[in-house]
Every structure is written in structure tokens, then in C-alpha cells.
Design a protein with these regions (language model features):
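Intrinsically disordered/low-complexity terminal segments and short unstructured peptides
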Residues: 4-6, 22-23, 92
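Post-signal/leader-peptide non-cytosolic segments of secretory proteins
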Residues: 28-116
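C-terminal segment of classical bacterial N-terminal signal peptides
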Residues: 17-26
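Bacterial N-terminal signal peptides that target proteins for export
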Residues: 2-14
Length: 116
């Protein structure tokens, strides 16, 4: 077998799974007009309004200010009094207000009606 055949075969073996992953992800996360991906983390494909996406980014930026200095009973990501984990996905420990956490849950619940 020639080096060229091996190289082409190797490229195909690498490229095919990548193409499949990209097209599958896009198909699963196609937002209706007027909605965008929330992007509260990489691969967060919940469809929300642009204002809601901006809010999630602001929460991410401000979250460290709402963590209990030195940690607490829930570890280093324990929130200060009056704040809770956002829980937009399993493991989301960004500290937000209880109202903001409920908004994230509402966004998750509405996602099906915001996707194509």
C-alpha cells in the first residue's frame, strides 16, 4: 500500500466523524427565527432570545462575585447568602438569584418550542 493511500485513508477516518458530529449538532440545535443559542457554556444549544443569551453571559461573568469566599458546605462553589446555583444543566454551579435560576429552568422547558 502506498503512502498516499494511507494518508488519504487516514484523513477520511478523521474527517468523517467530525463531519457527522458537526452536522448532527447543527441539526439538533437549529433555533427558530428570533432565537439564538444560549451559550452559557460550550455546547449549550438551548434556544433563547438574544437578550436572554446576553443575560447568561453576564451571569457567567458575575458568578464568581456571588461565591462564598473560602467556600462552604457545598465546596468551593458554595454561593453567598441569597444566591443559588443556576442549574441550567447538570453541574452548572454559576451563582445567581433564585429568580434567575427559575428563568434558566423556564428557558430549558421552552426550548422545544424555540427549535426547528
Amino acid at each position: 500500500m502506498s503512502n498516499q493511500s494511507i494518508t488519504i485513508g487516514s484523513l477520511f477516518a478523521i474527517a468523517l466523524p467530525l463531519v457527522f458530529a458537526v452536522t448532527t449538532g447543527a441539526a439538533l440545535a437549529d433555533c427558530k427565527s428570533g432565537f439564538v443559542w444560549r451559550e452559557a457554556r460550550p455546547n449549550d444549544f438551548v434556544c433563547v432570545t438574544p437578550a436572554q443569551r446576553s443575560e447568561a453571559k453576564a451571569q457567567n461573568a458575575n458568578g464568581p462575585n456571588n461565591v462564598q469566599p473560602g467556600g462552604g458546605p457545598y465546596g468551593p462553589t458554595t454561593c453567598r447568602q441569597g444566591y443559588v446555583w443556576r442549574e441550567a444543566w447538570d453541574g452548572d454551579t454559576v451563582c445567581v438569584t433564585p429568580t434567575e435560576r427559575q428563568e434558566a429552568k423556564n428557558e430549558n422547558a421552552a426550548n422545544a418550542s424555540h427549535t426547528n
